[in-house]
Amino acid sequence: ISPYVYVENDEVTSIPDHVIEPQKKNLALLMHGGLAGADFKPEECFPNIIRHSLNYINEQKDSKKPFFLYLPITAPHTPILPSKEFQGKTSIGPYGDFVVMIDDMVRQIVKTLKKNKQLDNTIIVFASDNGCAGYIGVKDMEKKGHFPSYIYRGYKSDIYEGGHRIPLIVSWKGKYGKETNNSLVSLIDFYATFAQMLNHNLETEEAVDSYSMWPILSKKGASARKDLVHEAGEGYLSLRTSQLKLVFYGGSGGFSYPVKPADVAKFPPMQLFDIVKDPSEKENIIGDKRYENEVKEMKRAMKQYVENGRSTPGEKVSNDTKNSWNQVKIFMQEEEGI
């Protein structure tokens, strides 16, 4: 979203001086329009970020100090503009080609670390910030046999699993083989993870929702996380445990049906899913008496998290909203039954 500029050392590299027109292909949004800096060309954005990242890694070649590179790439987000050499690499269009470009970026980073003899001493974490966006030509991709949300319901912005389940891949030479860990974790857990890894003592108001994954990564134990709060694009919340997911709203809270108030009103005000038995969230079991106690406990937990200003153990942290915004009323107000 405009203005499209590069920011380097806390300053924009050029002042916006022209307008870029929006781009679409087969009804898929490739790029929003808007103001752009003089040195900004959309198709060069991702390659520029890759180049700067590789340069930074090379600059650390002879350093004796640990280095950290946070690389929030623009792909496969809009603007969906794969470089010329990647166009046509897949059969599902620009989005698929852009994903292949990400694969090549990973290849370049690993190759550079290996060349600099740093690979064996580097932890690489690959993740996404959310599920696939439903407005980038998903229906066309599905017709071609590619389902970006896999078996999961919904897309980016939705409260459903398709909006929140992401790849989280950790590579650490000599520590892991080809293995999978099904622990309940979140990207916010990296704050506490890095703190524990570096022996940093967290202050009261630091990482109030973050549980360390270091016991998992170091193979010395498990995360203390028992549940996880999700938030939809419209601010509606859900609470997820290892088996159940309670949604404190009757709709998606994002772009997928049901969205319009008239449609949401057709459904119960809350949704409950057994994520283990029903990972696709097809059956809302909120009225099932067998889960009545679990629902009550999950509502109490959410209320406590809001009142405490945190979902981790520790001193209370004040919210500036008086705990009364619309999306939390359903569990902040005492109600009988479900």
Task: Outline where the language-model segments fall.
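Short, solvent-exposed turn/loop segments enriched in Gly/Ser/Thr/Pro and often Arg
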Residues: 1, 69-79, 126-133, 209, ...
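Long, internal low-complexity/basic segments
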Residues: 190, 252-253, 261-270, 275-338
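Short glycine/proline- and acidic residue-enriched helix-loop micro-motifs
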Residues: 28-42
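Histidine-centered active-site microenvironments of extracellular/periplasmic hydrolases
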Residues: 79-82, 88-94, 98, 114-175, ...
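Active-site His/acidic residue clusters
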Residues: 2-4, 8-11, 51-98, 133-134, ...
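C-terminal cap/loop subdomain of S1 sulfatases and analogous C-terminal strand-loop tails that border
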Residues: 134-138, 144-159, 175-183, 188-271, ...
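Loop/turn elements at helix/coil->beta-strand transitions in domains of secreted/extracellular proteins
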Residues: 62-69, 117-124, 165-166, 222-226, ...
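Core domains of carbohydrate- and sulfate-ester-processing enzymes
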Residues: 1-32, 133-166, 246-259, 325-338
